[in-house]
Amino acid sequence: MHKYNAYRKAASTIAKYPEKITSGKEAKKLDGVGEKIAKKIDEILATGKLEKLEKIRADDTNVAINLMTRVTGIGPAAARKLVDDGITTIEELRKHQDKLNHHQKIGLKHFEDFEKRIPRPEMEKLETFIKAQVEDLDPDYIATICGSYRRGAASSGDIDILLTHPEYTSADEKQPELLLSVVKQLEKSSLVTDTISLGESKFMGVCQLPAEEEDEEDHLFRRIDIRLIPKDQYFCGTLYFTGSDMFNKDMRAKAIEAGFTLNEYTIRPMGSTGIAGEPLPVNSEKDVFDVIGMAYKKPSERNM
């Protein structure tokens, strides 16, 4: 507080001085201007800026940019533009929603809820509810919640679902109606509340677990993604989207050592020319482990 008052007093004195200040030495003659402030005046006169102030401003800018990127849908470039436009807080952002696209508006609308992790008991309820709805629609569907939840995590950031149907394989034309039907079913059941985007094979949106009689308050709004994958690629997909990232990298490296190439779609043998062959049939995650000669690990054993 003492330093703040010292700067305030010096600024007031300089502002009232009738002549243009040309040096720190000249400024020191004024009441309240000491050696440190005089040096800063010399720096401003010589360079047009003050390094310490520039660092503070840069730090403030970075803090504001990091805050903006916490809003779902706002990336670093969009965040910097907002901050350059003078928007540095969530409150200010709410007053300037004309600068946001559809995705970003939904991210802002549910900002506080999306900041909170989803406890495992809630994830388990969501899984039970979603699977029941999908089975009611068509029992041939297969739906798996992947990510850290499948690895046994105590909490999750969002709900990431892989969906498939035996009538859909990679040899077929895309079948967006398979995804659309599930999304409509989840909307009808009041689980899905907002659509961020809906394409041929991926839905991004918002969901809220419907309240039950014993619930004291409504559940929070959560981010949900659903990916539709051909049945013949499903188990490579669940393996990949279950993770962890480090486990996936380790498994891909072991596949290469064994003469195969593995990604989120297929596992294929590598020929002597370095060109990958036809995808191998995969009917379970264990099939992939077996092909590359790796001991099977349950999802809960894949945290690295």
Give the label of every model feature segment.
Residues Y4-I159, L163-F203, F235, K249, ...:
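Accessory alpha-helical DNA-binding modules that contact the DNA backbone or grooves
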Residues G152-A153, E216-D218:
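Short, conserved, surface-exposed binding loops centered on an aromatic residue
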Residues S170-Q175, P210-E217:
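Intrinsically disordered, low-complexity domain-flanking/linker segments in eukaryotic proteins
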